[in-house]
Structures are given as C-alpha cells and as structure tokens.
Amino acid sequence: MSDTVLVLDCMNIFIRCYAANPKMSSHGHHIGGTVGFLKTLRGVCNKFSPTKIVAVWEGGGSSRRRSIHPGYKKGKKPKRMNRFYEDDIPDTEKNKNLQIASLISLLKKLPVCQVYVGDCECDDVIGYLCKYTLRNENKVIVSSDQDYYQLLNEKTKIYRLGKKEVVEAEDVIDLTGVSCENYCLAKCLVGDSSDSISGIKGAGFKSVAKRFPVLTTDKEADLMQIFEAASANIDKKIKLYREIVDNFDVVKRNWRLIYLDTSNLSADQMDQINHIIDTFEPTRNKITLMRELIKLGIQNLDVEGLLLSMIYVK
C-alpha cells in the first residue's frame, strides 16, 4: 500500500457539517459541526487509509489579496442551518466558534497535524503544501472548493464530499470544459462570484474553451497567449475578444487573486508551514479524548472506530 496524505480543508468541511447536521449535545447546545466533522474524518480515513493527515484552518483571510482587490470576498454570505431545524437551533457566530474551538481541541488528541498560519487563507497553505512541502507525496485534498482543480496532477487528487467522488487531473475537462493545467487561467477570465471576483463580460468556461482551444490542452498557457489571441481576433464579430483586450487589467488582477502558489505568502508564513509539518508528532490519546467528549456532552461517538480508521497514520 502506497503512502497517502489526507489534506483537509477544515472550514469547508466544518461549514458543510455545521449547516446540515442538527446534532445537539446533552447540554442542549448545537454540536453538529463538530460531530459531523469527526464522522466525515472517519469516513475519508476508511476510504483512503492515510499515512498522514494534515488539517488546514483559515488564518483570518489574506491581507495581500484585499490590497489587490478591496472587494475580495466582501459580503460573502455564510451557509444557513438545515432549514427543517432552523427554529430550534441557534445559528450564531458564538456557537460556531465554540464548536470550532472544541473540534481543534479534540483533533489534538488524534494523529492529525493541524496547520494554522495567521493572515493567510487555507487555499494558499494547501497550495503551498501540494506544490512544495508535500510535492513528492500522494495527496488527497478533501474539499468541495473547485479552486483546487489547478493543483491536480499525478500526485494530487480531490475528494468532493457533496458528491462523494474522487476528482483526478483528467476529470477536470469533463467537469469544466478546460484542462486542470489551464483551469486557473480560464477562471481568471470567467471570474468567481462566490468570492466577489468579477470576470470578463460574456466569459464562461464553455465560451472561453471554444474561443481559446489551448485552454483544453494539457499544455499550460499563460496570460500573454490569451491577450495575443484575443488581439488577433479583435475585429471579428465575437465581442468576447474585445472585452478581454479592453479589460485585460481585470484578468491580470484575477490571476494574482486566484493562482495558488507562493505569491500571497510571506517567507515567514512559509517557514511556519514547514516547521509545523516537520516537527509534528502524531498522538492517540483515547482516554483524554473520551473525557473531553463527555465534558462537551457528545454522546454515542464511535471513538474506537475513529481511532481504527487512522491505524496507518505514522
């Protein structure tokens, strides 16, 4: 069996569970985010038998991205609670933060390396891990965030929780119409409304794939290739070409926002990431874990099954 690193997009997983799982503690508090996360963790561990688990938390957002685009992620709406239970479960920041704090504490009793780096986004940390720190390891990113498509290669896969499916590099063209090598570039043209990133008027994945066939190949294109191709066709009736040429500053800005590499991380932040990974020692503290679950009022969680799912972690 080859070694596999599970890379968890923690907030992505937690928010899914928090919004959908109505589980209440014996103290009468909503605890579905915490319980759902642990059950999800057990499930993906059983599926992939990881030898290492890296759980990446949001670090408060990227000031570098906000300096590039002040409207970045502005007004992003949080997921609502499961509507069937809305009247009974308080959907509050306080409850959510308490659940996250509880989850972080519980994960410390498990062989899970938690990574938190201030003033940067989870996406950037995962991008750095995949491209540099863990570049030679087989990795499975657990997230529903499509931004990670740009990281896919023979060493990196994505497990989409919602659809319970594995996405590999060759799958991206069927899912989006463009290759994983050019997904980021295509998204710079299309934009990302969920993060308040405007794109080029009339640009969608289907249309940019049609007008710029290089985006469908496994050869990585660059910004200037798109600009030159659009300029060469600017006199044609298709408006998309002129829109790209006239608004190319938007495309360049979007590249700085969407591309996952080291550009939005400082040297100190990269050192922090490497230090956390290099110095982590896995632990399995069953008794302390069970005591904390009792204290939190979390009942009927299969601790044995959770620990057994991580049997290969070293």
Residue map of PLM features:
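Intrinsically disordered, low-complexity segments enriched in polar/charged residues with Gly/Pro
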Residues: 100-101, 144, 184-189
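Noncatalytic, basic helical substrate-engagement surface that gates or grips nucleic-acid strands
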Residues: 2-142, 148-166, 259, 264-279
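Non-catalytic nucleic-acid-binding/docking modules located in mid-to-C-terminal regions
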Residues: 2, 43, 47-57, 71-79, ...
